[in-house]
Amino acid sequence: MQNKSEKHFDRIRSFVLRAGRTTAGQQRAIDELGPEFLIPFQENLLDLQHAFNGSSRPKILEIGFGMGETTAKIAALRAADDFLAIEVHPPGVGALLKVIGETHLTNLRLIRHDAVEVLEKMLAPNSLDGIHIYFADPWHKKRHHKRRLIQAGFVKLLVSRLKPGAYLHLATDWHNYAEQMLLVLNAESGLTNTSAEKISIETFSGADVASDSEIAKDSFKEFKPTLEQLQSKHSGYVERPDYRPITKFENRGIKLGHGVWDLVYQKKS
């Protein structure tokens, strides 16, 4: 049962519905493999061990797996872990189920639903050994930054579901979003940045700092840096962990001249 004392943060969706047609092969995978590997959304807590046929292996959550190539590769590489992967788009769900069938992966389960509601309703506090969020929509335009997934309220929800000592791994190919992630996550008291490097903020300026009138509003939840953050050095990024393969999004970003930033945090004990 969900802890009623938990404060539900202002609604932010983990996804945007996009057009895309499910192929016959993807639909076949959903029909044939869905009953075994696709977990329906429910309003009560999921028994993670039961969901993986009694497995007591560490449980890793992935939010937004796209077409599932990276998820499948990581699950195959890390056979000693179980992976619960969330995606809303049927073509991606079908594509990953198809790979599961072709490669006989047994340590992977999928949920097709909004990740925020899955975290709130289905996953118990202190139940996860790790969380992966790779290449979430950066919402490039400044007026859309409020739609970005990595905001303080959502991060608190993530941290609450991690076990003490568990990790949170994010990656993005958009520098400004990387810096927002960094500032939001570094400010979360329940997390420790595992990076040894120190960096300065480059993509935000004084014009982005929240005004006193904005801060005074109870409804103001959008991330904006403080002047102190812009003037300080911060614990930074890490090298891409070996278990995360280079994705098509990463290659696309590199071709466009973008960098790729990995952030890894550990929940404090």
Feature annotation, model-predicted:
Residues M1-L61, E69-A72, A76:
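S-adenosyl-L-methionine
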Residues P58-E117:
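SAM cofactor-binding core of SAM-dependent methyltransferases
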Residues E120-G130:
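A short acidic, Gly/Pro-enriched loop at the edge of an enzyme's catalytic core
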Residues L128-R148:
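A short SAM/SAH-binding and catalytic strip from SAM-dependent methyltransferases
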Residues H144, A171-E188:
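Conserved class I S-adenosyl-L-methionine
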Residues I150-P164:
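A short glycine-rich, Lys/Arg-flanked "PGG" loop and its adjoining helix->strand segment in the class I
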Residues P164-T172:
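Conserved beta-strand signature within the Rossmann-like core of class I S-adenosyl-L-methionine
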Residues L183, E188-S269:
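Class I S-adenosyl-L-methionine
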